[in-house]
Amino acid sequence: GPSLLSQSKGVSMSHAGWLVAMFEIAGILGMLFAGWATDKWLKGRAHRTCVFCMAGSALFVFLFWQLPADAPIWLLFATLCAAGFCIYGPQALIGIAAANQATKRAAATANGLTGLFGYASTLVSGVGLGFVAQHYGWNWAYVGIIGMAVVGMLVFLLMWGARADGYEAETE
């Protein structure tokens, strides 16, 4: 959050706090949009929405990374908010996608596992990203963030052909 902004982009801590807050707000709006788009355009296929969100996350983090430290604050704001808009969709939809694919037989287990991995990844990403940034620099931290977004997109792509849920197959 603020450390990344101040150390890699030279943003003051007061501006960094505001940027992080706006990132979170953009994330909430993106999460709501991802849910709506899943229902409206992708016929409940949350995994497809996640593909687009992860691609957007990778793109906007890359663009943010490439901005020079003396870039206008509004440009940092725009790219960071766009990244936040894309990042929160998969976080909200992964539990739904897993529960829908698992059907009622294992929906609670699927949701529990996605929650477990979500919390574990938060712990690992905080420590891991800090380690990479401290020992190898922020450029490698950005590479790691973008790399994980691409890996996430590829994992969701594996489900591209899946139905919105497994309930039809369960009754057949």
Per-range role (PLM):
Residues 55-69:
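C-terminal ends and interior cores of transmembrane alpha-helices
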Residues 43, 98-107:
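Paired intracellular helix-loop junctions of major facilitator superfamily
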Residues 1-15:
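Short amphipathic helix-loop junctions that connect adjacent transmembrane helices
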